[in-house]
């Protein structure tokens, strides 16, 4: 499996959070694609 994205932390900027959420969505898509 690819490494899970790390949370930016409490003092992260909104841009960092947006990048993190996009990375999480991509990560979940990779995992579910491999499973089926």
Swiss-Prot record:
Entry's InterPro entries? Pancreatic_hormone-like (IPR001955), Pancreatic_hormone-like_CS (IPR020392)
Which UniProt key words apply to this protein? Amidation, Hormone, Secreted
Keyword Nucleotide-binding: yes or no? no
- Origin organism is Myoxocephalus scorpius (Shorthorn sculpin)
Signal peptide residue numbers = none
This protein's record includes keyword Repeat:
no
| Protein name, per record | Peptide YY-like
Which compartments is it annotated to reside in? Answer: Secreted
> Tell me, what is one Gene Ontology molecular-function annotation carried by this entry?
neuropeptide Y receptor binding
Q: What is its main location?
A: secreted
GO cellular component annotations, sorted alphabetically?
A: extracellular space
**Which biological process, per GO, is one annotated for this protein?**
neuropeptide signaling pathway
């Amino acid at each position: 499996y690819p490494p899970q994205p790390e949370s930016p932390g409490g003092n992260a900027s909104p841009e960092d959070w947006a990048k993190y959420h996009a990375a999480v969505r991509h990560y979940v898509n990779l995992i579910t694609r491999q499973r089926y």
